[in-house]
């Protein structure tokens, strides 16, 4: 619903290979102008390939070529209309090729450890002591993690780079609870 209520989106299009999802999406007001091919519908399908399929289909079948494309993954449903509109405003203001939503990481990267099959603990990046993370939490550098809620791409940049994180990528910081 956040996408349908956003004033910055011309169209809300769902890409799916599932008839039930397509019907529900249309019932709630989204468009499903095509069904996603099965080769782009498995767990290992790269997002960029799914996006490129949608862009090409819309261009070839409707002569529709948007300036921006926003990926809103259904696995991150807590984004708001305001999040969508603010991330779009950031893209315009910064002339960004991409805006991706993030949240402050709960853990410092150097506190992340690996555990072997026999339960032995080892450093992932480097020793927390060597990394200087035994300082107060307030004095540490902040780190951010992708939260999967918003991926906004300038379509021409996506087509040129064929990658999800082009050079001119900015972040839209969301609160941890979303």
What are these regions (language model features)?
Residues 8, 28-30, 117:
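Short, structured coil segments at secondary-structure junctions
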Residues 39-43, 107-108, 177-178:
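A short acidic, often aromatic-flanked loop/helix-cap motif at beta-alpha or helix-coil junctions
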